[in-house]
Amino acid sequence: MTDAYQKAGVDVTAGYEVVARIQKKVGADNHNIGSFGGQYALEMAQYQKPVLVSSTDGVGTKLMVAFAADQHATIGIDCVAMCVNDIVAQGAQPLYFLDYLATGKTDPDKIEDIVAGVLEGCKQANMALIGGETAEMPGMYAAKHYDVAGFAVGIAEQDALVTGETIQAGDVLIGLASSGIHSNGYSLVRKIFFEQNNLTVASQLPELPGKTLGDWLLTPTKIYVEDLQPLLQQRVIKGAAHITGGGFIENVPRMLPADLAAHLTLGSWPILPIFKALQQYGQLAEMEMYNIFNMGIGMVLAVAPEAAPAVLAQLNAKQEQAYQIGTVQKRQQAAVELVTAK
């Protein structure tokens, strides 16, 4: 059967090697890798009324940049980040993660790089990788192409969930810096740089010093678990928005009651060079940028005005870049208004 499968384009031996390499990286004591299902022992005694919070996501067409650059070591971090930032924004403590990777041809070295990134992401999020799936699918994907998705599960006390329900006019909005574009908007990014301007991943732009364009674009998505967990334990976060696809305009309203709006103060945080380059090379309007990209802020928190100074001090004491970027007001028109500093 192995020979027949091999002739059909599926390399079973390479698949076995991948499992062996992953087991070695994860650790011999983790018996979930290679088993039929992942297991996680939950200590229920420490919870009164626990709620499980889950999320699934992928990395989108950022993968196309990784293919072009043949750099895959940070894609796994992106995959974990996209899932875990969503659940921590709801007040959950991450528990465990599973990954799914489909490829046209099994390349053990490449898959090892990807899974190493997943493990690094799980380490940053303080969660366990308890299993996953690698599927070789010739004819579905090109030989050197793959797709990756992740599944994260976390837990929170029911009365500690961050729902946004207690947000009110006058509350302060705090922005946590992003590491770059993160993992959204790459279809437009690739069109601007690679199609409209005929650049490559090896290009070096004066607006983006020190690294190639590919390196700038493959900067891994920031994981906010370590920053937010102490604040969640203190229960000072009223609402949180993970700034992903749709930028501020789509994501900030997701945490707000319908009668409230976010007033974001332009100039209250630094815009990263990659966004300035995108706007310049793509000739995009400013509002369009805020409607697509995170613009240097990957997570927005809503806190009471009296709590804001301590929250900012606590974040910045950890060498985190956090900024007071606006306030919550009664909604008059749009759910997000960009205002100029007075």
UniProtKB/Swiss-Prot annotation:
InterPro entries: PurM-like_C_dom, PurM-like_C_sf, PurM-like_N, PurM-like_N_sf, PurM_cligase. One of its GO terms (molecular function) is phosphoribosylamine-glycine ligase activity. It comes from the Bacteria. Coiled coil: none annotated. Its EC number is 6.3.3.1. Keywords: ATP-binding, Cytoplasm, Ligase, Nucleotide-binding, Purine biosynthesis. It catalyses: 2-formamido-N(1)-(5-O-phospho-beta-D-ribosyl)acetamidine + ATP = 5-amino-1-(5-phospho-beta-D-ribosyl)imidazole + ADP + phosphate + H(+). The keyword Ligase applies. Pathway: Purine metabolism; IMP biosynthesis via de novo pathway; 5-amino-1-(5-phospho-D-ribosyl)imidazole from N(2)-formyl-N(1)-(5-phospho-D-ribosyl)glycinamide: step 2/2. PANTHER family: TRIFUNCTIONAL PURINE BIOSYNTHETIC PROTEIN ADENOSINE-3 (PTHR10520:SF12), TRIFUNCTIONAL PURINE BIOSYNTHETIC PROTEIN ADENOSINE-3-RELATED (PTHR10520). Belongs to the AIR synthase family. This is Phosphoribosylformylglycinamidine cyclo-ligase. It comes from Latilactobacillus sakei subsp. sakei (strain 23K) (Lactobacillus sakei subsp. sakei).
